[in-house]
Amino acid sequence: MQYQGKPEYFARELARLAAEGVRILGGCCGTTPAHIAALRAALDALPGQLPVAAAAPIPTAAKPEVETDDAFLRKLNAGKKVIAIELDSPKDADLTGYLDGARRLQAAGADLLTIADCPIARARMDSSLVACRVHRELGLNVLPHMTCRDRNLNATKALLLGLYAEGVREVLAITGDPIPTAERDEVKNVYQFNSRKLAQYIVSLAGEGREMPSPLTVFGALNLNARNFDVELRRAQEKLQNGMSGFLTQPVLSAQAVVNLKKTRETLGEKAKILAGIMPVVSQRNAIFMENEVNGIHVDAEIIERFAGLDRVQGEELGLEVSVKAAQAAAPYADGFYLMTPFNRIALMERLIARLKDEGIAD
């Protein structure tokens, strides 16, 4: 390899730097003996004593940003039953109504807002951007979901750094629903990670000399309704080994889900934080759809039958009662509750939060 620049140009430019005070000059692998000889001659031709550049002050390393006060984690680690509530981001570019709903849920007593990452692989407003806006404007703790479906390593890292800079300190790492078969010619799955590897990568970004001064808290998903729950539980143990701190479960809508939740607590111990999923059923049609069409949800037949013939008001009342009883059954084995908002019914969720608090099920 050889520089294209002529020796005369090389010598003239470096001699100019020497006249400004640079004291150590030379060439890299592309220079030839002719370049160095020309430089020596140019330096010898400079008049008088070469000036010495004043030493520039060495900049001190900036101190890491002061840690944000994480009220959610503080309450969770204190052993109090927390309330996290999921509110799907908008399908369009208008966030006004969403922020109004988030304010109402915050005022009702929600400790954390979770935002799904394009559920069922349908595009919505980005969960992380929505989370940052909510956290910035409302001061409410947020838990953006982060799937492995849509981002490679570079995009994932860039997003995580942005979340940290915005004060977001919790993420939910999930594999994510695959792109529907009919759309795969236009939309591609990425899946560079699975949820366990994603969690491991997230926690690896923190520490001395790393990109983040302190680690993000990573949660994962736990399906209490899995047909082979022993396999699901083994995966949960692997997720903990890869850096996850706890789990948000699928809805508790069956007696078996409570049994599996109890088994989870006995197997994982108190170290793993578990938020039991509570999703109000609002009609028989809704219950039948969840039982037959939504992966990871099982609704007991008795619950489905109880909704027969009910109108909207009656359906919400029964859904509220079923949800409160599910939370009561789950409470001994959970560190809090993960409430899922059906059909954007904020008023229903306000009532559910109030009931959980009034009856001492949540703090």
Language model: regions and residue ranges:
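Domain-level signal for soluble alpha/beta catalytic cores
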Residues: 1-363
